[in-house]
Amino acid sequence: MNKHQIGLNAGIVWHLLNNNERWTYCELKKASGLSDRDLDAAIGWLAREDKIDFDSLQGDMDCVFLSVNVFIG
């Protein structure tokens, strides 16, 4: 795995999240076809760039969704 591949995988995840819905990890994994390692790296990339947010559901399940960054100034 290299930075270029992680960036490509982050693009795959971003396009899935672009429908403005909340996705669970399992849903993202199934829809993206990425391995756990590749999906984790892609989510980490998007989180580091402040492109996504996380929302906790009941139990141990978290959802991932695109964050809206609006800067007025």
Where are these regions (language model features)?
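Short amphipathic alpha-helical interaction segments
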Residues: 34-45
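Short amphipathic alpha-helical interface segments
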Residues: 5-31
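A local structural micro-motif
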Residues: 25, 37, 54-55
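Short, cationic-aromatic polyanion-contact patches
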Residues: 3-10, 56-73
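Residue-level detection of the helix-turn-helix DNA-binding "recognition helix"
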Residues: 18, 44, 48
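A short, conserved structural fragment
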Residues: 47-57
